[in-house]
Amino acid sequence: MEPAMEPETLEARINRATNPLNKELNWASINSFCEQLNEDFEGPPLATRLLAHKIQSPQEWEAIQALTVLETCMKSCGKRFHDEVGKFRFLNELIKVVSPKYLGSRTSEKVKSKILELLYSWTVCLPEEVKIAEAYQMLKKQGIVKSDPKLPEDAIFPLPPPRPKNVIFEDEEKSKMLARLLKSSHPEDLRAANKLIKEMVQEDQKRMEKISKRVNAIEEVNNNVKLLTEMVMSHSQGAASSSSEDLMKELYQRCERMRPTLFRLASDTEDNDEALAEILQANDNLTQVINLYKQLVRGEEVNGDATASSIPGSTSALLDLSGLDLPPPGTTQPATPTRPGNQSSPEQLSASVSLLDDELMSLGLSDPTPPSGTSSDSVGWDNFQSSDGTESSVPPPAQAPSMDCRPPAQAPPPTSSGLDDLDLLGKTLMQQALPPEAQQVRWEKQQPAPRLTLRDLQSKSSSPSPGAASLLHTTSPEPPGPPPQATPTEFSLTSITVPLESIKPSSILPVTVYDQHGFRVLFHFARDPLPGRSDVLVVVVSMLSTAPQPIRNIVFQSAVPKVMKVRLQPPSGTELPAFNPIVHPSAITQVLLLANPQKEKVRLRYKLIFTMGDQTYNEMGDVDQFPPPETWGSL
């Protein structure tokens, strides 16, 4: 019985590729040598030793073939091989062939010219391999290189795209251990190496299964979303039959079942921002079509919004005031979380829902926001600003109006109507719209201004109303002039509150701020700026836990340089339960407002405090991965 054939070695392939009996270049053998070099873990160092021996052959044809193999490998084998060629150990073997002190007197001019041509082409194409350039310059100084050779067109090769990493060997520690075990001659080490290889292969198989599962799930979501959207739009035009309604209902139920699947996929997607962005987009589409079905087919309200109320002009509070010119406010007041009144469309609703967290699932959109205390801006690196208004010992600079400029706005009780909340917000924003001269007057000495509702503001946003003009006249001793240039005291954020539901996500990928101990904090950037405040960036801070223990007493604080201002609105909670992949997990979201009127490069310092088990963590760090300030108005 014939013994089983062993796989061909690199040495056998190089012998066949450089055989002196070859009538012409054996490109099949050359390419197979390059392919195996890429596949073998120890391929590059072994290949350079074999090539050095062949290049020093006294037979010119064998040496020329070896140099052709070397040139081909440099063009197709990537950085690992470049690093081996760029070592003095291999370069010295080439220098021996061209130097008269060694083999130069016995080497043909054709071989020496080819070596010098290769060295020069590598200095041009691989400037990062400095040792190659040093070797070539040394040959110049010794007079071996009289002038730079003229390179043929195919000598200056474009660098190949980076080869995809073999994930099995990405773990540096395991790779080093495996290399050490394979070099050992002890049977125990070889058995350990075999076991380690099996473990690494199994890990890679699990990773590939996760990727396949994610791709299939996203594809299924996109197909269901597309079909359900078409059927819902057809239903809204009155062209749907009873059978199509049953199909719509089935598609809707299928979309609902895909929500926890997307969340689990996001939980398994650890640090792959590109894959996470695909999941975000799929969930955004899923949420949009679910809300569209509820509104147009069932006629249900979605987060206080019904199709019947989605009429022109019935937009959210901030959009109602988009026509007003809001100069930087100079007053302070307690931050009051407001609830959205009406949404303009299902697209706005779904976009805001999709921004709430990294995983975008089960984030408690209907949970009541805890009442906030007085917020204060961060005045520098020494002051961390948090949602409860507490800071370090350095007090913030005094604002021009005192705190008693108007009655503090109380958090609306659960039974209050949405219009009352919007009217209160309308009054607040109207006072912000006053010029700085009018805000310098102490309000307690004036007669209270008539309370304008949000609808009044909407109808009069294009031109100042007589009431507003009289208000300016009675409160300002001088006629208002052009608004002055913004100063550090005029871009306060304390009177601005952005409802989470009104935020739309941008196309920028989220930034991971903190990811340790199973606790993850991310920054999501809003697409639209605040009306009249293009210097303000709206960020949603998302906190999610995959830890096996509950996380309590979570506090996120932030600070920026003194030329900027930062404010954190109250978080949606301070505790996260232990992670359970079966049930929908909780998450914490918090709106961060960042004012940067001078458009400086942003560097934010954060402090994160939380308790996990019996241990309290106090983490600090910096974040500078913000969009360029000049693009804040159109992310």
UniProtKB/Swiss-Prot annotation:
UniProt keyword terms in alphabetical order: Acetylation, Endosome, Golgi apparatus, Membrane, Phosphoprotein, Protein transport, Transport, Ubl conjugation
Placement of sequence motif Autoinhibitory: 357-361
Compositional bias of kind Low complexity: 313-325, 459-476
Modified residues (Phosphoserine): S185, S354, S417
Domain VHS positions: 17-147
Subunit relationships: Monomer. Interacts with GGA2 and GGA3. Binds to clathrin and activated ARFs, including ARF1, ARF5 and ARF6. Interacts with RABEP1 and RABGEF1. Interacts with the type-I membrane proteins LRP3, M6PR/CD-MPR and IGF2R/CI-MPR. Interacts (via N-terminal VHS domain) with SORL1/sorLA and SORT1 (via C-terminal cytosolic domain). Interacts with EPN4. Interacts with CCDC91. Interacts with HEATR5B/p200a. Interacts with SYNRG/gamma-synergin. Interacts (via GAE doamin) with NECAP1 and NECAP2. Interacts (via GAE domain) with AFTPH/aftiphilin. Interacts with TSG101 and UBC. Interacts with RNF11.
Domains (record comment): The VHS domain functions as a recognition module for sorting signals composed of an acidic cluster followed by two leucines (DXXLL motif).
Protein name: ADP-ribosylation factor-binding protein GGA1
Species whose genome carries this gene: Mus musculus
Gene name for this UniProt entry: Gga1
